[in-house]
């Protein structure tokens, strides 16, 4: 093995966002661009010699090339073992599961999540730490600092790994283990949920489920778990083959982009349960027949019905939600007498709460839900959670949610997404608006009196770290809110 040291120079645009570094594929295809970020990541970590690294991605265009580069750089930087999903594939939840199960030092996940893929689409990379969760801000800031001073990177001069062959291979002094990307995750799901009850539900001819994988990573996971293990009808999983361009679609599971599923769920022949996941498998949308469940209501209903699921039947330690998520989960936490934490958007902010057992279930406004079973949000886990609730309660989705509203009240909101706006214009709008905030407190807007106006700041109750400028908030005396924030996941 020959380790090469390649001279390079910094790129000024490599600051990680809410969930890693996301740019157009053409940006990542620049000479040294990916390598600079990977080396800057390794340099931000403590001694990696002899450690294990998990590597995988959502299968979008540029994924396999990036996996090969990362493996060669990991070998050059001293890792002794790499665990890689077959064909370079791992959903983000599965990657978190694998990191935790095999006690890896960390992992590199290749995904731009719900963003479009293909040669003209987006690509992304992020580092997850040993607990399986996204790197906290202290590490991402160190990575960014390194990208601004990098002068060289290390890579082994060796051939490519055969990513399609399960088993062990050698790359320099590093062992590369190619694993089934679904197996470990499926085993974890079987430990959490009552698979027998769900299997019985799915065998009932009156019950039908449709799962839209949107030509992204969750297709193989859905087919194996829903159809092969739990016995759902063949064809339950639609758009189930991962494509490098996601079928030229936008794999964001919402009412706009999951149109095929939504049209079926609001038809006369609607299945009992409809669900969709996104590019890397960490988001979910839940639908009943002619009924849409908002992300915040989904989290609230899941928390209120935790006793239906074996892994959570002994109770929840707490609930955590992102600041823009509606306050529906707060009502459940109050009734259960447990903590409810409000964090900035970004799953990395839930990690400390989960590790410290201050929260069991977490959710955010962009169709993300998860729990302490891993340290990422988890789309298919949420679908199985709803199936478990339906199997126990033997009611429809609409009946369960409407009964929830009767008990806890209903939180209404509307969300408006403004996409592909030039970032400088969006930032200036936010700056100008915030400048007016001091004069708004005490005023009435549309008949509602403003009680506070601020830029959300979060103090982590576990490590006391402070995250500022996490979104503009206008709060009213009746408890209603107006929230504005810049996306940290767009390109």
Where are these regions (language model features)?
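Buried hydrophobic positions in well-ordered alpha/beta secondary-structure cores of metabolic enzymes
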Residues: 19, 55, 95, 108, ...
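Positively charged, low-complexity intrinsically disordered leader regions
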Residues: 1-36
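Glycine-rich phosphate/diphosphate-binding loops that line cofactor/substrate pockets in enzymes
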Residues: 38-53, 195-205
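Gly/Ser/Thr-enriched, mixed-charge loops and adjacent short helices
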Residues: 2-11, 32, 121-269
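Short glycine-rich or small-residue beta-strand-to-loop segments that form or flank ligand, phosphate
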Residues: 24, 52-58, 126-128, 208-212, ...
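N-terminal small/polar loop signature for handling phosphorylated ligands or for N-terminal nucleophile
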Residues: 54-121, 224-286
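Phosphate-binding and adjacent anionic-ligand microenvironments
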Residues: 271-273, 277, 286-289, 310-491
């Amino acid at each position: 093995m020959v380790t090469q040291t390649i001279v390079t120079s910094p790129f000024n645009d490599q600051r990680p966002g809410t969930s890693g570094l996301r740019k157009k594929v053409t940006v990542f295809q620049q000479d040294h661009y990916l390598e600079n970020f990977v080396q800057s990541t390794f340099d931000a970590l403590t001694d990696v010699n002899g450690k294990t690294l998990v590597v995988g991605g959502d299968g979008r265009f540029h994924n396999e090339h990036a996996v090969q580069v990362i493996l060669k750089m990991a070998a050059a930087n001293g890792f002794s073992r790499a665990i890689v999903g077959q064909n370079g594939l791992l959903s983000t939840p599965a990657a978190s599961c694998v990191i935790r199960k095999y006690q890896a030092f960390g992992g590199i996940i290749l995904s731009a999540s719900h963003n479009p893929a293909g040669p003209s689409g987006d690509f992304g990379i992020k580092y997850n730490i040993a607990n399986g969760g996204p790197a906290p801000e202290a590490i991402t800031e160190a990575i960014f600092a390194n990208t601004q001073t990098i002068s060289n990177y290390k890579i082994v001069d060796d051939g490519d790994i055969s990513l399609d062959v399960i088993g062990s291979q050698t790359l320099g002094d590093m062992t590369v283990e190619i694993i089934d990307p679904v197996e470990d995750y499926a085993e974890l799901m079987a430990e959490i949920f009552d698979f027998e009850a769900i299997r019985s539900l799915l065998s009932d001819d009156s019950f039908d489920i449709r799962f839209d994988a949107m030509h992204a990573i969750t297709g193989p996971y859905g087919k194996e778990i829903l159809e092969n293990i739990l016995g759902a009808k063949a064809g339950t999983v639609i758009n189930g083959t991962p494509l490098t361009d996601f079928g030229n679609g936008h794999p964001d599971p919402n009412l706009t982009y999951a149109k095929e599923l939504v049209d079926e769920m609001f038809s006369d022949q609607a299945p009992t349960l409809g669900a969709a996941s996104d590019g890397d498998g960490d988001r979910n949308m839940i639908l009943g027949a002619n009924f849409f469940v908002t992300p915040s209501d989904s989290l609230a209903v899941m928390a209120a019905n935790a006793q239906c699921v074996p892994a959570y039947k002994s109770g929840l330690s707490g609930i955590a939600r992102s600041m823009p998520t509606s306050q529906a989960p707060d009502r459940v936490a109050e009734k259960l007498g447990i903590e409810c934490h409000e964090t900035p958007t970004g799953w990395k902010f839930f990690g400390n709460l989960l590790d410290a057992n201050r929260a069991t279930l977490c959710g955010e406004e962009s169709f993300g839900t998860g729990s302490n079973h891993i340290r990422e949000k988890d789309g298919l886990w949420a679908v199985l959670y709803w199936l478990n609730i339906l199997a126990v309660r033997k009611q429809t989705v609409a009946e369960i949610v409407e009964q929830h509203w009767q008990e806890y009240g209903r939180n209404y909101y509307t969300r408006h997404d403004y996409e592909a706006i030039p970032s400088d214009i969006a930032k200036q709008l936010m700056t100008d608006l915030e400048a007016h905030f001091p004069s708004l407190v005490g005023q009435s807007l549309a008949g509602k009196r403003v009680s506070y106006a601020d830029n959300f700041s979060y103090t982590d109750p576990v490590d006391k770290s402070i995250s500022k400028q996490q979104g503009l908030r206008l709060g009213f005396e009746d408890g209603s809110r107006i929230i504005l924030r810049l996306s940290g996941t767009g390109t």
